[in-house]
């Protein structure tokens, strides 16, 4: 089962996914969003009756912007309507620029048992070049915290970044492995039509 939280802290210059920067005053209207997700899930149930769900992936945008209580509510909605296997993998995407130690622990308490961290690079220069909201120190701290809180986690890395050499990309891979990442997802920077990077 895949669900998306299309809210982001800032627009990402290379991203062409359906995502929206929250520009409203006050908090993100999480209850309204979850109500809409519930409606969507209930409309889709006839398509999946009788199937057993092995994994749940809460993608983005940046679902880690939502409160742990909202993630708990989302997982309760899913569990009460779909048949999940015992010990189902429940992954949530997180941005190193939006993490706090207690939030990670609260997401785990809500039932998230795997984090996918959008590190992209451990180089401040590369992160700045692609307009990320976090820096290298925040990326390292998020990976280290994920290693201590979650049973398993993923680190997203990008390569072919502006000004990035082969040695720079290899250094990112080495650092992710040294920090104990059990899973890596490596993506080539793609210039998608309609994004600032493509123009």
Predicted stretch roles:
Residues 1-8:
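Single conserved hydrophobic/aromatic residue that forms the stacking wall/gate
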Residues 9-19:
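Local cysteine-cluster metal-coordination motifs and their immediate loop/turn environment
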Residues 19-47, 51-199:
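Conserved non-cysteine loop/helix-boundary elements of the Radical SAM core domain that shape
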